[in-house]
């Protein structure tokens, strides 16, 4: 199995690619990590340091992978934290490119917005992009309760909701 994983990278803690890549590799998955940010820690701490990777840079990395034939045989694209709205566009472009080379590939989106305890961790334009464009393009989404409420415009309190 081959996965293109477009997510955050943090030095302190385990979220995004910092949490996903090693376990997937340990079970034999070929993971191509592309980072959306390179932060000291996740933004839920309220303060962090490090760069947001521009959408154009993410697209350049995907282009380099594509030029080497790396998008052929991809089984899934995973996406997570999107610190800027250009990142969402780059992810959607990457999904389209992967599907051009690997039509059966699925797109799994973790619509990282925040959580009930600490609220929203992303800018309003990112919230809208995720809800209006990224989630509809996904085959699978993995929202937490807070994110599900935002995406659906509801306030789910139980599993049934």
Across the structure, where does each feature detected by a protein language model lie?
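Intrinsic structural disorder
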Residues: 1, 24, 145-149
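Conserved N-terminal subdomain of the carbohydrate kinase-like
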Residues: 2-109, 113-117
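Conserved phosphate/ATP/ADP-binding segment of small-molecule kinases
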Residues: 120-161
């Amino acid at each position: 199995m081959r996965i293109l994983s477009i997510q955050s990278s943090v030095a302190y803690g385990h979220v995004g690619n910092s949490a996903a890549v090693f376990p997937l590799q340990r079970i034999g998955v070929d993971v191509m990590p592309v980072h959306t940010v390179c932060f000291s820690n996740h933004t839920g701490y309220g303060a962090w340091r490090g760069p947001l990777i521009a959408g154009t840079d993410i697209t350049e990395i995907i282009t380099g992978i594509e030029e080497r034939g790396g998008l052929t045989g991809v089984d899934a694209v995973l996406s997570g934290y999107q610190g800027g709205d250009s990142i969402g566009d780059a992810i959607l472009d990457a999904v389209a490119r992967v599907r051009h080379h690997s039509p059966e590939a699925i797109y799994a989106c973790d619509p990282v917005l925040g959580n009930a305890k600490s609220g929203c961790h992303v800018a309003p334009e990112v919230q809208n992009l995720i809800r209006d464009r990224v989630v509809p393009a996904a085959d699978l989404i993995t929202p937490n309760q807070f994110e599900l409420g935002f995406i659906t415009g509801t306030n789910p309190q139980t599993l049934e909701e």
